[in-house]
């Protein structure tokens, strides 16, 4: 009986895998379907779903989100030939996709914003500031605890802010990030009564639990990170819907979507906006 159950289970799994592969093959062959890999923040907030509805209504294409989540997941999906288009934060991963021949026509199309989160008693008195560098300068002057977060995007931007602040994050007031998961960084900061720079979306949405912490500084254009869009290279991957990917990529940079970003960009739990247009966006 046990052997029969195992055989039945494996047979069922094989059928599921076969069906899944068949659906992917059919999608790849369907010129009306655009398979996408989308960074998690866009699907979590509903931005991508709204843009998808607009695109489908205006063009007749159908968007299929094949992969969503952190950047490594999207990177793997493009390299495996599962998607026609990818959108995520710019960085080494996206540059490597282009350098390795998987991605083409990489263009920025929107930005999100980072913020400074800290304890409610705000020992450095930065609450309400809209200049990140000036806020860090005050944190350094007060020698208030500050977490050197290891998050890829945050770390790059914070280095820029410290340079603009004309201060160095050195001393026992600078705490090393030793969290196992980046989503625990606000809890770590709370435990140490410290400030930290993180993305506004995960902080405001609860993706990074922030009990006992407050968003104190936001609204600085310098604290914004670009998202790029790129199409899969048909010379590297077969079965790519290049026409559909190009149409969607151009659509993201269209005046209609760029205007919509600010209309959409109000987080239900906070003042927003969440996403920002690219001033020079042109298809």
Map each language-model feature to its residues.
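Acidic, polar ligand-binding/catalytic clefts
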Residues: 85-111
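Extracellular structured ligand-interaction cores
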Residues: 111-113, 226
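Conserved Nudix-box catalytic region and its N-terminal flanking loop in Nudix hydrolases
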Residues: 72
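Bacterial N-terminal signal peptides
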Residues: 10-18
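Bacterial N-terminal signal peptides that target proteins for export
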Residues: 2-10
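Serine endopeptidase catalytic core focused on the charge-relay Asp
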Residues: 116
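Exported/periplasmic ABC-transporter solute-binding proteins
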Residues: 21-62, 67, 76-82, 91, ...
């Amino acid at each position: 009986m046990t052997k029969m159950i195992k055989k039945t289970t494996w047979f069922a799994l094989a059928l599921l895998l076969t069906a899944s592969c068949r659906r992917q093959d059919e999608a790849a062959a369907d010129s009306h379907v655009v398979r996408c890999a989308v960074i998690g923040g866009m699907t979590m907030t509903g931005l991508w779903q709204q843009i998808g509805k607009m695109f489908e209504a205006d063009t007749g294409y159908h968007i299929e989100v094949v992969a969503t989540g952190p950047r490594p997941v999207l990177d793997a999906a493009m390299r495996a030939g599962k998607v026609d288009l990818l959108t995520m934060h710019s960085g080494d991963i996206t540059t490597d996709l282009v350098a390795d021949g998987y991605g083409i026509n990489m263009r920025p199309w929107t930005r999100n914003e980072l913020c400074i989160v800290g304890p409610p008693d705000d020992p450095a008195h930065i609450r309400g500031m809209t200049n990140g560098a000036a806020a860090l300068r005050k944190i350094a002057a007060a020698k208030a605890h500050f977490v050197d977060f290891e998050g890829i995007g945050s770390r790059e931007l914070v280095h820029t802010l410290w340079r603009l602040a004309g201060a160095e994050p050195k001393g026992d007031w600078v705490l090393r990030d030793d969290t196992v998961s980046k989503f625990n960084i606000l809890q770590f900061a709370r435990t140490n009564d410290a400030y930290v720079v993180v993305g506004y979306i995960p902080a405001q949405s609860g993706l990074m639990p922030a009990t006992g912490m407050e968003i104190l500084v936001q609204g600085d254009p310098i604290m914004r990170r670009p998202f790029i869009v790129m199409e899969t290279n048909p010379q590297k991957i077969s079965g790519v819907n290049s026409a559909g990917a190009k149409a969607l990529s151009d659509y993201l940079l269209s005046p209609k979507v760029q205007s919509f970003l600010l209309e959409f960009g109000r987080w239900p739990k906070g003042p927003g906006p969440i996403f920002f247009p690219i001033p020079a966006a042109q298809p």
